[in-house]
Amino acid sequence: MQDVQGPRPGSPGDAEDRRELGLHRGEVNFGGSGKKRGKFVRVPSGVAPSVLFDLLLAEWHLPAPNLVVSLVGEEQPFAMKSWLRDVLRKGLVKAAQSTGAWILTSALRVGLARHVGQAVRDHSLASTSTKVRVVAVGMASLGRVLHRRILEEAQEDFPVHYPEDDGGSQGPLCSLDSNLSHFILVEPGPPGKGDGLTELRLRLEKHISEQRAGYGGTGSIEIPVLCLLVNGDPNTLERISRAVEQAAPWLILVGSGGIADVLAALVNQPHLLVPKVAEKQFKEKFPSKHFSWEDIVRWTKLLQNITSHQHLLTVYDFEQEGSEELDTVILKALVKACKSHSQEPQDYLDELKLAVAWDRVDIAKSEIFNGDVEWKSCDLEEVMVDALVSNKPEFVRLFVDNGADVADFLTYGRLQELYRSVSRKSLLFDLLQRKQEEARLTLAGLGTQQAREPPAGPPAFSLHEVSRVLKDFLQDACRGFYQDGRPGDRRRAEKGPAKRPTGQKWLLDLNQKSENPWRDLFLWAVLQNRHEMATYFWAMGQEGVAAALAACKILKEMSHLETEAEAARATREAKYERLALDLFSECYSNSEARAFALLVRRNRCWSKTTCLHLATEADAKAFFAHDGVQAFLTRIWWGDMAAGTPILRLLGAFLCPALVYTNLITFSEEAPLRTGLEDLQDLDSLDTEKSPLYGLQSRVEELVEAPRAQGDRGPRAVFLLTRWRKFWGAPVTVFLGNVVMYFAFLFLFTYVLLVDFRPPPQGPSGPEVTLYFWVFTLVLEEIRQGFFTDEDTHLVKKFTLYVGDNWNKCDMVAIFLFIVGVTCRMLPSAFEAGRTVLAMDFMVFTLRLIHIFAIHKQLGPKIIVVERMMKDVFFFLFFLSVWLVAYGVTTQALLHPHDGRLEWIFRRVLYRPYLQIFGQIPLDEIDEARVNCSTHPLLLEDSPSCPSLYANWLVILLLVTFLLVTNVLLMNLLIAMFSYTFQVVQGNADMFWKFQRYNLIVEYHERPALAPPFILLSHLSLTLRRVFKKEAEHKREHLERDLPDPLDQKVVTWETVQKENFLSKMEKRRRDSEGEVLRKTAHRVDFIAKYLGGLREQEKRIKCLESQINYCSVLVSSVADVLAQGGGPRSSQHCGEGSQLVAADHRGGLDGWEQPGAGQPPSDT
């Protein structure tokens, strides 16, 4: 058994080797306007089939076949029915195209092969793809080829001209079919050796059936060879008999006439196959021909041999059962031929591989997975790989439903092979290749000799490159993926990025089973843009909300790298976001508390990343706009205070903290403190939690420390401390404090800048020093936000994330300008420059106030509108500047051609046209009657020069045109752009506002309770806690928490159950859709048609039984007549002869018909 992966360049060798083998290759140009060209080879009848097969692959570069259809039939002109013509022209060519098949047919333009050639021609003319073509190889005996001498005298390097005759044949000679492109011409063999063409074709079919090929170059499927019988004369029986002895399956088209109809009538009743019955069939199918009794007897023997291999024969009637396509019929014929009576799964693998290669999951369900065989996971591993590589999600689902265990199937080695099988034209292949090249150059820089030269052959990607690609897309959400699976290393991976030893590979055992097989397959499918398969893996895996959001993030990043497919990826990204949103809706409707916990729990499969973090990275605005997420954010925003508390009450408590201990502000009911062991154990259930917003660990600590606090300070001290923390720790209070203090900061800045800004040495004054200190506390807070937020992140990445926020950039600019302004202000020589810089800095600090509007439902979306309009203005200014410069330079050249002063040139070229847009038109320069200037040299130095009046009319015309374009056209264009931007944002105003609201709540949730300048106390507290290694207050626990293992598993199981409910509802909606109802109706109609076809088959069997009964009654009547004609010895003799006759007929024996004197058949009775 050999693997066929494609052309093998070493077989056969050069032209001299081919001549030694008797091969003479050449090219032929057919006449006519089409200028068709074909390749041919003249071979001896005894050539080895392996040499011929290698010639087709290596020399002619034909793609390795997944199926070979050998067309056998009538080689003389005959009347073809319309349905049979459609089967050949549409069904056969379509089946060959869809399955990657070769068609072996006659090379002569006559009979059945003529129609096949026309079908191939029509397909080549209609097809727009050069990659998908139908391979039709014509074989013929050289002795039957018209213009044979032209082909015999052809040289290999010089194409010969072959005349194309309209008739196609002259007596027994026929011309080559110009619709084919490859010809095998068999030279006549020695006399008495029979038909060399038939012998060679049989040996070639046998050799091809012993080769292996497969989709994707897997080389795991035996190449099936199917013989298709259409019409045919009785001499075809010898060909069929020898083929079935080689276990070649046959598909017989009923109604095509000739020997095909004879076989169709006799294949189901081999016990009645006697010469008399065969003769009757031959006379019916060939009424114009006369056959000798010796031929009848010989053909009857062949028919008996053929019908004894019924498992290789498939009879199909397209006139009555025409609802199925020919490729389906072919696959069923192959399944029937290779089907064994054994119940071992190994005996069904080849037919299962064929079904996978041809994507016929319906046949796999009905013929293979019908309950007769018990499949094990190990039996389906090979076909599972084929289905994954060739993107057959329905087969993957079928295998999983019938015993395939993905946990046992997916090892890291097999996952690595899946990534190595990605298409070379995909974006993933380019990314992996780029990462591999970066690693090679890194190792080369370290002096590794083997890494200096690029590896030969196709790139062998490893999971190391995959993990680096995923890290670019998912950042911290894939930390530790595909690294050493030892527990210690896994814990280190969760805490921080793993550091690989210099010059070493990842220590990952490729034989180890994947810890999260569904997640790994899901990522593999998403990276390859296989949406249907990825959706199935998502449905089968855990942590569905997090997985869908991770897919959103991946597709968003990939769309930035591949702009051509950005629209398609955006559609799929929205689909995954919809999956996450719908699944969370299902969870939220079932349990609000568990849904909140789902948002903040650290997902085990995604490197301890929360759903909120993934949604932020994926910019999933629709997810944040969900009512459940907003309800959770509302609880976080108000903390333990009652939601909806009036702002005036909050402001009163902020200005007078003693009011916190009154009933001015309502706090949540405080549950009685429980410190028993049973109470602590109750925390394992989410349903027993009073509020799911705070971390379980903090609640346990409160319960443990409660008796100590009561013992030390008493209940009143506990009440005062708890109320104080609840008020000042709420994000709404932090936000209010920052807003109030920021207004105070701006008021102080205004006072200093306008009233108390003294030059040195009198200044700076006390209020100005207070302003410096205030800005110093602002700087400390920005440093904390940039470098002291997440301990598990590198400083460079922290700074990158900090700079990525636009408001942080605004803060950096404001602080930088303030430092520059203060530095200049301290120098007497640069005092005015310092005032100028500080004045500009005040404007930046004031614009920073816009950020607080994000919490307002009406004003929040307007910030997005302003931001997008600024981008629109940038592109608008490009068009405006083109007209501005063109008009300004032209008018300057016409009005002031001799004025070379640079400041005046700039003023007239740019500044004056810009003012003219707003209506300030200098008539004293344009209107000749209003010109007022002097040409005196002493007055000309500081005053404008007199304009030139030579082309005054042209300047006025240019002014009119300029005002028309800028004031009417461009301004209206800008208004239209602004209107479109406003409509887009306003249409999604609620979604934009809710997303902004989330970012604002998270920001102030993580900020210290005190606002600048008092925030310095909070910074000192954090510093002291770090110095004394005392654990700081983890407000982050409200947005990220680690659940105990039993509780975490309970949440995961609950989410999985909700996902199953969601998928069942989706399936129900799909079943109730109009398209699905129509599909089911069509399926039922097909079922009824098949049922009626079965009734026709039963009717045929009844008629067959009636004919058999009639035949037996005739025999019985003849015996009775013989017995009734005489008595005595003569009667006995006749009786014995009659008995022998009946016995011989029922045995089906042929010896009695070959006795001397029995050359003629008995008369019909």
Swiss-Prot record:
A Pfam entry, by short name: LSDAT_euk
Catalytic activity: Na(+)(in) = Na(+)(out); K(+)(in) = K(+)(out)
Domain of life: Eukaryota
Main subcellular localisation: membrane
Residue ranges of the TM segments: 731-755, 766-785, 807-825, 833-855, 865-894, 952-986
Tissue distribution of the protein: Strongly expressed in fetal brain, liver and kidney, and in adult prostate, testis, ovary, colon and peripheral blood leukocytes. Also expressed in a large proportion of Wilms' tumors and rhabdomyosarcomas. In monochromosomal cell lines shows exclusive paternal expression.
Post-translational modification Phosphoserine, affected residues: 129
Extracellular side: 756-765, 826-832, 895-903, 940-951
Residues engaged in binding Ca(2+) 1: 222, 338, 347, 350-351
BP term (GO), one: calcium ion transmembrane transport
Start-end of Basic and acidic residues biased regions: 486-497
Keyword terms of this UniProt record: Calcium, Cell membrane, Coiled coil, Ion channel, Ion transport, Ligand-gated ion channel, Membrane, Metal-binding, Phosphoprotein, Receptor, Transmembrane, Transmembrane helix, Transport, Voltage-gated channel
Calcium listed as a keyword: yes
Ranges per topology, Cytoplasmic: 1-730, 786-806, 856-864, 987-1165
Coiled-coil region: 553-581
GO cellular component entries: dendrite; membrane; monoatomic ion channel complex; neuronal cell body; plasma membrane
Family: Belongs to the transient receptor (TC 1.A.4) family. LTrpC subfamily. TRPM5 sub-subfamily.
Assembly and oligomerization: Homotetramer.
Description of its domains: Contains two Ca(2+)-binding sites that are allosterically coupled. The binding site in the intracellular domain modulates the voltage dependence and the accessibility of Ca(2+) in the transmembrane domain.
Function: Monovalent cation-selective ion channel activated by intracellular Ca(2+) in a voltage- and temperature-dependent manner. Mediates the transport of Na(+), K(+) and Cs(+) ions equally well. Activated directly by increase in intracellular Ca(2+), but is impermeable to it. The activation mechanism of TRPM5 involves a multistep process.
Protein name stated in the entry: Transient receptor potential cation channel subfamily M member 5
Species, as recorded: Homo sapiens (Human)
Organism taxonomic ancestry: Eukaryota, Metazoa, Chordata, Craniata, Vertebrata
